[in-house]
Swiss-Prot record:
GO terms for biological process: methylation; terpene metabolic process. Transmembrane segments: none annotated. The keyword Transferase applies. It catalyses: (2E)-geranyl diphosphate + S-adenosyl-L-methionine = (E)-2-methylgeranyl diphosphate + S-adenosyl-L-homocysteine + H(+). Its EC number is 2.1.1.255. The lineage of its organism: Bacteria, Bacillati, Actinomycetota, Actinomycetes, Kitasatosporales. Belongs to the geranyl diphosphate 2-C-methyltransferase family. This is Geranyl diphosphate 2-C-methyltransferase. It comes from the Bacteria. Keywords: Magnesium, Methyltransferase, S-adenosyl-L-methionine, Transferase. InterPro entries: Erg6_SMT_methyltransf, GPPMT_Stmyces, Methyltransf_11, SAM-dependent_MTases_sf. GO terms for molecular function: C-methyltransferase activity; magnesium ion binding; S-adenosyl-L-methionine binding; S-adenosylmethionine-dependent methyltransferase activity.
Amino acid sequence: MTTETTTATATAKIPAPATPYQEDIARYWNNEARPVNLRLGDVDGLYHHHYGIGPVDRAALGDPEHSEYEKKVIAELHRLESAQAEFLMDHLGQAGPDDTLVDAGCGRGGSMVMAHRRFGSRVEGVTLSAAQADFGNRRARELRIDDHVRSRVCNMLDTPFDKGAVTASWNNESTMYVDLHDLFSEHSRFLKVGGRYVTITGCWNPRYGQPSKWVSQINAHFECNIHSRREYLRAMADNRLVPHTIVDLTPDTLPYWELRATSSLVTGIEKAFIESYRDGSFQYVLIAADRV
């Protein structure tokens, strides 16, 4: 089964969701309109679907009793989310205008815009959600970068990119929706030899023993399947992706969650993230690997 999409240059047949689960995920994100994603993006037009890192700027927040305090909290949360995307891009390696980058699980496209601004590269995003792809493409047109930045409805396990055609690719909090071996096999296929892969993700800590009750709550909330840190490294090694940088971002993301829990944008899952980070059962990590 395929769906047909038309671009300025060609009409491409893109695989539809391959399983009932993928259809569920597409439906989930097509219907998603959480204020925490939209209101933060309204700050500067970069719409993210990931969390933040770094210390909270308390001076910028000011007095909690001030009438503008909530607006400042929203701006600060957004700043931390953009800082996370910048940190991911710090690990993408060298890229330029002649290169193609891939955002697998691109959401509404905020990171794609940032990547194009930073590297000048063509950036291709894939998502199961037609609503997300439409949103991202509309923003690209508004910014007049749609000749370089494109989102498409596509299964990230079966992309249309040619073998060895991509310089760098990433998953930013989207790996928990797929089998890791299938995912890394696809990245390995379309990345050129020497290309760079980066992921930032939440993973359960094998040292804890099994996924904790907090991790189970996160899985249920997002209809996903969080993997262990060990599974990432094993699946990468099996697919010619050699990790060279692993950064534990758990202490860096906790301030974001603690601030978000005080805002009007809570979704009910904040406690699970905070408690699982504190008890060590859940970790937030960056892994960068090279295609060999």
